[in-house]
C-alpha cells in the first residue's frame, strides 16, 4: 500500500467512532497472536525490544536499523499497520528526526512517535522550543505518508506539571502532529484536560500498570482515540515465565510445562507466511 493510502487508512482508525486499541508486539509470534485476535493495527515497544535483546531502553542501545528491521518483521508477518515507538527520533537534531521519519516511511510503517526525552538523566526532558521544533521536523518530513505522534514524557520522568504537558501537546498539534500523547496521565481529570486542550487532534493514552486502570469504554468516553500498551503485554508474558520457573524450582513440572501448544505456535507462524 503506498504511503499516502496507508496514512489515510491508519488515520481513519483514529477518527472513527470509538477509536483504536493498538497493542504492542515484541516479536513475530506476539504480533501474529495480536493479528489473529482481530486487532486492526499494532505497534512496536522500544522498551520491549530492548529487553528482548538484553539492553536498556531510552539510551539508543537498540539502533535505529535494528528497530526498523523489527518493525518491518511485524508488518511483513501480519500485514497490519505498524506504529513505530521510535523514542526521541534517534538523534539530537531536527534533521536527525527527519531522517528517521524518512527511514520509517521507506520501511512501510504506518506511524511513528517522537518523544521530547533527551537521554540525559540530569535533564530528561528537552526544552519546549527544541521539543516543538523536532516534532515540526517530523511532520514536514512525513509529507502525508506516515502518521506522526508528538509525545511528551513529563509524567513518566517525574514532572507532574499538567500545565506544561498541555502546553507541549497543544504546540505539537499546532505544528501538525496527527496524534498527541502523554504516557501515564495521573488521573481521569488530567486525561480529559488533555483531550479538551488539543481537540480535534486524536489523543493516544498509555495507562500506568496499576489497579486503577480505566476500562477501554471509560477511556473512549473520556475522548481518547487510541489506546496503546507499551511494554505491558511483554511484562505480563514475562511474569508468567517467572511464575513458571519458580514452580519448576519448587518441583512442579506440570505448572512449568503447560501453555500454548506448539501446534498452535506453528499454526500462527503458518498464517504469517500466507
Predicted regions located by residue number:
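Extended, intrinsically disordered, low-complexity segments
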Residues: 3, 10, 230-274
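Alpha/beta enzyme core
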Residues: 2-205, 209-229, 236
Amino acid at each position: 500500500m503506498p504511503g499516502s493510502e496507508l496514512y489515510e487508512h491508519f488515520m481513519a482508525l483514529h477518527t472513527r467512532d470509538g477509536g483504536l486499541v493498538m497493542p504492542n508486539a515484541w516479536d513475530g509470534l506476539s504480533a501474529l497472536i495480536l493479528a489473529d485476535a482481530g486487532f486492526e493495527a499494532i505497534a512496536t515497544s522500544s522498551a520491549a525490544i530492548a529487553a528482548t535483546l538484553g539492553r536498556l531502553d531510552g539510551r539508543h542501545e537498540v539502533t535505529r536499523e535494528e528497530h526498523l528491521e523489527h518493525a518491518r518483521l511485524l508488518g511483513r508477518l501480519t500485514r497490519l499497520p505498524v506504529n513505530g515507538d521510535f523514542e526521541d527520533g534517534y538523534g539530537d537534531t531536527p534533521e536527525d528526526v527527519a531522517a528517521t521519519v524518512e527511514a520509517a516511511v521507506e520501511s512501510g510503517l504506518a506511524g511513528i512517535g517522537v518523544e521530547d526525552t533527551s537521554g540525559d538523566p540530569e535533564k530528561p526532558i528537552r526544552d519546549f522550543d527544541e521539543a516543538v521544533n523536532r516534532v515540526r521536523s517530523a511532520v514536514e518530513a512525513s509529507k502525508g505518508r506516515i502518521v506522526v505522534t508528538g509525545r511528551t514524557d513529563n509524567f513518566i520522568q517525574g514532572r507532574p506539571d499538567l500545565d506544561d504537558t498541555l502546553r507541549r501537546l497543544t504546540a505539537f498539534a499546532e505544528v501538525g502532529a496527527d496524534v498527541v500523547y502523554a504516557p501515564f496521565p495521573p488521573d481521569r481529570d488530567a486525561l480529559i484536560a488533555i483531550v479538551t486542550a488539543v481537540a480535534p487532534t486524536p489523543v493516544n493514552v498509555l495507562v500506568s500498570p496499576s489497579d486503577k486502570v480505566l476500562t477501554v469504554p471509560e477511556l473512549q468516553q473520556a475522548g481518547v482515540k487510541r489506546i496503546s500498551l507499551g511494554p505491558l503485554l511483554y511484562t505480563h508474558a514475562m511474569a508468567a515465565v517467572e511464575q513458571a520457573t519458580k514452580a519448576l524450582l519448587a518441583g512442579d513440572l506440570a505448572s512449568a510445562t503447560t501453555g500454548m501448544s506448539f501446534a498452535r505456535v506453528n499454526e500462527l507462524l503458518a498464517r504469517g507466511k500466507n
